[in-house]
């Protein structure tokens, strides 16, 4: 690393004739003040004063350094001794210091771009040229330097560089994307777009919110049939017990999960209204008169976000166990939840029924000793394979390349145990498309949530957590993509649950082109 700084030392007044004393002070500082704590042989990494000049009551200084006594730390070190020199002799004090221009250079071989680096606080600009990152900082006041904001930016920059070697690759002993199991080929009975056909038939209707749909009686009957089928084939055989998980998750829980560091842009944030009747009275009056929602008034009546709507569905399980002590003899703890929607903001990523903002899942979560944690995860995958075969669907399972819980852990931290394979992802093949739709995400977290939520075993034995999400909304999409909408092409035990279910008769819907 290399740091180049242009700074200002502001004196309390202009004092002529102090240049000789300043020259002597800076020369001695090179071998004393700026060398303290620097290991022998690494003096070249310490801060050096490249030039200085006095203009009135302002001392302009340029410094360079390596990673030992960074240039801004060197500037801070100069302030007090300089005041002790000038005060008694010239009756002048040092009012403050600031940095007008600061750049950092860092070697990053193989890294071609880190867009988020330029978006960090206090960063003016960032670029990568010939394997070297150049970061230019905004002007910094003394208070910024003393709060170590610069050091935190540097640390985060290093983290971003190191994370370019994906942590998933670092911790996974298998190759992400490697297919580990595949079904036999199946006949497909549909060639169109399932979303378009479902709309044409009136099985779904687009809802005004982005990535949202109204699911009508037919597709809901299919949903319930598949849900009950998976519970009978996967959930009950493994001994999971049903619970009702909250879906409004406090930000503190998401912070413990490291979700806010990893994917803050992928969640819906929620705010509670303030207890201010006057604000809402004004809001109601303007709404009545203008017939438009006065967003400025609404914002005034809403508190800062305090929650997110559940983006992972498993969040309450870790909070339920937080600061609790369990005994290995009583493990595993196995819960499942199917009580409602999961929400993710996909921005421009939402398309049809296969990628929505609001979707249904059966979520399995468990706590066990490491070996059993992996065994449970593997059994959920095996039983999912069996279920897909019984449904006469074509599928494949691969090593996951994006375990959700690794998003916020950009560099591997000491003391956190990771499984050999953090995630398996099962996909249903889609006619005419190379990549199938993901329907099962089976994860082992190691001690990620054990550490984050302070969960402990009574004798300090190792315990891990795991979760498997059975994505009902995507199972339906994959099922319809392969089987089509004619129930005669479906397995009888599914088709009979949907036959006889009809949409209400509405003159204008579904629209017939």
UniProtKB/Swiss-Prot annotation:
Compartments it resides in: Cytoplasm
A single GO cellular-component term on record: cytoplasm
Gene3D superfamilies, A to Z: 3.30.70.1920, Bira Bifunctional Protein, Domain 2 (3.30.930.10)
SUPFAM superfamilies documented for this protein: Class II aaRS and biotin synthetases (SSF55681)
Cofactor(s) listed in the protein's UniProt record: Zn(2+)
The record's free-text note on cofactor binding: Binds 1 Zn(2+) ion per subunit. This ion is coordinated with 2 cysteines, 1 glutamate and a water molecule that dissociates from the zinc ion to allow the coordination of the amino group of the serine substrate, which is essential for catalysis.
Keywords associated with the record: Aminoacyl-tRNA synthetase, ATP-binding, Cytoplasm, Ligase, Metal-binding, Nucleotide-binding, Protein biosynthesis, Zinc
Source organism, top-level taxon: Archaea
Summary of subunit composition and partner proteins: Homodimer.
Protein name: Type-2 serine--tRNA ligase
Species name: Methanothermobacter thermautotrophicus (strain ATCC 29096 / DSM 1053 / JCM 10044 / NBRC 100330 / Delta H) (Methanobacterium thermoautotrophicum)
């Amino acid at each position: 690393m290399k740091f180049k700084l242009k700074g200002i030392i502001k004196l309390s007044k202009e004092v002529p004739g102090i240049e000789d004393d300043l020259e002597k002070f800076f020369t001695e500082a090179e071998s004393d003040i700026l060398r303290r704590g620097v290991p022998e042989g690494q003096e070249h990494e310490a801060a050096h004063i490249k030039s200085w000049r006095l203009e009135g009551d302002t001392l302009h200084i340029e410094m360079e350094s390596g990673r030992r006594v960074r240039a801004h730390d060197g500037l801070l070190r100069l302030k007090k001794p300089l005041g002790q020199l000038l005060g008694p002799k010239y009756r002048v004090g040092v009012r403050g210091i600031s940095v007008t221009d600061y750049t950092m250079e860092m070697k990053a071989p193989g890294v071609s771009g880190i867009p988020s680096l330029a978006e960090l606080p206090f960063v003016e600009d960032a670029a990568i040229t010939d394997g070297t990152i150049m970061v230019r900082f905004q002007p910094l006041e003394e208070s910024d330097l003393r709060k170590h904001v610069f050091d935190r930016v540097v640390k985060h920059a290093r983290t971003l560089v190191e994370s370019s070697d994906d942590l998933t690759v670092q911790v996974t002993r298998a190759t992400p994307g490697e297919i580990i199991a595949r079904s036999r080929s199946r006949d497909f009975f549909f060639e169109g777009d399932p979303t378009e056909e479902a709309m044409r038939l009136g099985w779904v209707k687009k809802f005004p919110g982005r990535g949202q749909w109204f699911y009508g009686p037919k597709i809901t009957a299919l949903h319930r049939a598949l849900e009950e089928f998976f519970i009978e084939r996967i959930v009950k055989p493994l001994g999971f017990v049903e619970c009702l998980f909250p879906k409004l998750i406090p930000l503190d829980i998401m912070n413990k999960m490291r979700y806010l560091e990893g994917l803050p842009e992928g969640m819906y944030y929620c705010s509670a209204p303030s207890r201010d009747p006057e604000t809402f009275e004004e809001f109601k009056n303007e709404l009545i008169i203008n017939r438009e929602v006065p967003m400025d008034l609404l914002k005034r009546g809403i508190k800062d976000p305090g929650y997110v709507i559940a983006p992972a569905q498993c969040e309450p399980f870790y909070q339920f166990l937080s600061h609790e002590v369990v005994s290995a003899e009583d493990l595993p703890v196995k819960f499942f939840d199917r009580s409602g929607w999961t929400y993710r903001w996909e921005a421009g990523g939402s398309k049809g029924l296969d990628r929505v903002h609001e979707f249904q899942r059966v979520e399995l979560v468990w706590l066990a000793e490491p070996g059993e944690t992996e065994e449970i995860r593997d059994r959920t995958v095996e039983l999912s394979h069996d279920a897909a075969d019984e449904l006469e669907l074509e599928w494949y399972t691969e090593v996951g390349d994006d375990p959700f819980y690794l998003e916020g852990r950009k560099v591997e931290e000491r003391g956190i145990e990771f499984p050999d394979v953090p995630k398996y992802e099962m996909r249903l093949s889609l006619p005419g498309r190379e990549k199938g739709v993901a329907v099962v995400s089976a994860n082992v977290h190691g001690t990620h949530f054990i550490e984050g939520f302070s969960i402990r075993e009574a004798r300090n034995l190792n315990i891990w957590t795991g979760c498997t999400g059975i994505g009902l909304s995507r199972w339906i999409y994959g099922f319809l993509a392969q089987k089509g909408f004619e129930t005669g092409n479906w397995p009888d035990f599914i088709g009979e649950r949907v036959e006889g279910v009809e949409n209400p008769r509405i003159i204008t819907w579904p629209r017939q082109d």
